[in-house]
């Protein structure tokens, strides 16, 4: 019984990570947008932006899920303007978020 319960809990813990899994093409698209726009703040931590590769900064955001991260990316937060100040479509914006998340997993 305990073994089944542990397996069920582990499965639930993996759901957010699995929902963010992407293919190489999406990650390349995300990296391109990151390098053209997001890098300014997410490479330095300017205005409290979570730095690329900083697992500790990204973990609470990842725990909230992709929908929450996309809401922030789309609408902006703090000094970050909506869509990171770009005209990126939802697919490209999501690819950039997924790229940044992939750098800490």
Model features per residue range: what roles?
Residues 43-71:
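Gly/Gly-Pro-rich "capping" loops immediately C-terminal to redox-active cysteine motifs
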Residues 28-36:
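Local sequence-structure signature of Cys/Sec-based thiol-disulfide redox active-site neighborhoods
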Residues 50-51, 69-103:
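Axial heme c-ligation environment in periplasmic c-type cytochrome domains
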């Amino acid at each position: 019984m305990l073994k089944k319960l542990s397996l069920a809990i582990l499965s639930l813990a993996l759901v957010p990570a699995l929902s963010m899994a992407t293919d190489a093409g999406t990650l390349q698209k995300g990296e391109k947008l990151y390098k053209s726009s997001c890098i300014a703040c997410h490479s330095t931590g300017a205005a409290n932006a979570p730095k690329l590769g900083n697992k500790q900064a990204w973990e609470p955001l990842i725990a909230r899920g992709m929908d929450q991260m996309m809401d922030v990316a789309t609408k902006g937060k703090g000094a970050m303007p909506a869509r990171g100040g770009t005209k990126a479509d939802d697919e490209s914006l999501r690819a950039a978020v997924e790229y940044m998340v992939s750098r800490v997993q």
